[in-house]
């Protein structure tokens, strides 16, 4: 916090530079409270677009300040308050969200859904959160971890060994990864592969029983449709959604088979790792996790459930560090990320990936 506080003081005094900007960005993730002592100054930083602040910074906005900002937006008659509106939208407070949303729709260049998903909420006059706040990080099995490190430089191995997202915390749930399922892909008709089998409560608080998330690694992202949907039975097992079944199977490129492993889902004590940025991580942090906020590679997007049409909450992401049985790595395109979503009402999962 001392380094962050000094950087914040120097930035407010008018000093600029790449190193200072980097410290400010990391501070917004590691010590957001340091930046929350002067909201107007923080808003000025956001309006410059030079510092990419974590969205969580604005979630601490006091209700009185939020109400004052909402009044400013309500009285504005031009687009000069875009930064204020974006910050108020990210705060996602029920009393002021609609005003921020209305201003952005009126004066911004993006539609309402884009703004809502950027804030992690469903499109509508009131915010409905589409992700949780307490992620569980994957604690990979011994053979998985050995394969993950095989071709990495020594400095990265050392970083992973010491980094809390790789080796910290306490296991809350056990799980399994890898291996074929009985269900077949609707596109290529090959068996789905097990992404994760664990207790349903890990994905949906209060749920009972188990859930198995499965996917065709060969078709997802390479063959239409871009989002793969699966219905889950009473035992939590997936089957291809009927609308995505092809009578004539496709012949996609073989992406390999996930290595079988017993894994743990770990809760970290520090609030620092509730939000993680994909670019900031730069392959140093473990970004594979269940719950919490997504680490988007591209733009934020929560798909609509194929059955009920409502935007689906985010439940899991898997980084491109997953070893396959053929001594390869699943890259999700090219160093990308797989995102998984869950509609509890319909018991439908959806999956897609993004890459650079």
Which residues make up each language-model segment?
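Preference for intrinsically disordered or flexible, low-complexity segments
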Residues: 1-356
